[in-house]
Every structure is written in structure tokens, then in C-alpha cells.
């Protein structure tokens, strides 16, 4: 899903894009925004002259030009998301619908314990307690093997808590 089409209708929005997730370039800390000429002009007034280093710029441009990588990444993310949703539905675990590379799952009062068990099993996920959502965990969509491992260890942790 994209909000880019809203730019033609509204002149007071900025659509931001990151290279962190789908392009797997989180370490270079680069992104861009799409907006009306008026908004871009205002940003130019406060923008630092050298806010993104040369290497990061080159990596970002190369990423945009590599359509095959983007297509494959989207396919892997979509199939991984579909798999996780099917498994979570089977387990009776609710989740928030998303168009990102992660899924937010709701585990209720057992969230912290499941989180601790999964961490001890080598599954790295994010607790959303610091964001005011103590009964939710954020799970990044991984490879097929990683997703299978997550579900296997999630099932194991839920059994331990029964």
C-alpha cells in the first residue's frame, strides 16, 4: 500500500521512504521524502548541506535501480507474512494487520513470559511495552527457515506456560 497517490490530491503531506527494511540497508540510515514543491522548499531552508554521506547515497541509488532485488524481497515478505498469519490463526493468536516487514502479535497477560522464553531460545523480537502496548510483541518477517523456527519456538513457549 502506498500514499504516493495522495500527493496529487493534497499539498500538505509528506510521504517518507526508508531503505532500512525492504532494501535491508538499516545501517546506512538513509531515506527520502516525497512532497509538494512548497513543502520541499521549506525543508531546504533547514536541511544540513551534507546530511547524507556519499557512500550511503550511492547505496540508496543502487538499491532503487535493482528492481529484481526489490521484487524478490517483496515476494519473500508476502509469503512469510502469509505463513505467519496462518500459523497465528491456528494458534488463536490475534495480530494487527500490516503492510510492513513485521507483524504485531497480541499475547495478553502471558506476553512478558513468552518474550523472555523466546529470547532465551535465541529468538529476537521486540517487546512493545515501552510504547504503551505491554501485551504485544513485534515479530520481523524472516526467511522461511527463520519463520518456521519462530513458530516452533512460540508453540513450545506456549506449552511451557500451560
Regions found by a protein language model. Give the residues of each.
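Conserved PLP phosphate-binding loop immediately N-terminal to the Schiff-base lysine helix
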Residues: 1-4, 23
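Nucleotide-activated donor-binding/catalytic signature segment of Leloir-type glycosyltransferases, i.e.
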Residues: 5-9, 13
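PLP-dependent aminotransferase class I/II
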Residues: 12-89, 93-96
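Short acidic/glycine-enriched loop/turn segments that link adjacent beta-strands
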Residues: 27, 99-100, 132-135
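Short hydrophobic/aromatic beta-strand micro-patches
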Residues: 34, 104-106, 140-142
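Conserved PLP-binding catalytic core of the aspartate aminotransferase-like
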Residues: 78, 87-121, 137
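PLP-dependent enzyme catalytic core of the Aspartate aminotransferase-like
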Residues: 117-121, 130-162
Amino acid at each position: 500500500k502506498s500514499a504516493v497517490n495522495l500527493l496529487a490530491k493534497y499539498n500538505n503531506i509528506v510521504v517518507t521512504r526508508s531503505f532500512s527494511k525492504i532494501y535491508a540497508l538499516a545501517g546506512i540510515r538513509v531515506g527520502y521524502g516525497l512532497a509538494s514543491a512548497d513543502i520541499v522548499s521549506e525543508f531546504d531552508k533547514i536541511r544540513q548541506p551534507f546530511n547524507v554521506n556519499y557512500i550511503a547515497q550511492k547505496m540508496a541509488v543502487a538499491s532503487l535501480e535493482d528492481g529484481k532485488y526489490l521484487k524478490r524481497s517483496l515476494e519473500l515478505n508476502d509469503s512469510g507474512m502469509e505463513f505467519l498469519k496462518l500459523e497465528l490463526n491456528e494458534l488463536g493468536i490475534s495480530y494487527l494487520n500490516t503492510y510492513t516487514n513485521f507483524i504485531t502479535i497480541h499475547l495478553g497477560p502471558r506476553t512478558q513470559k513468552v518474550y523472555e522464553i523466546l529470547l532465551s531460545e535465541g529468538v529476537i523480537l521486540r517487546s512493545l511495552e515501552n510504547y504503551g502496548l505491554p501485551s504485544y510483541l513485534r515479530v520481523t518477517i524472516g526467511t522461511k527457515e527463520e519463520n518456521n523456527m519462530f513458530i516452533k519456538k512460540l508453540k513450545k513457549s506456549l506449552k511451557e506456560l500451560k
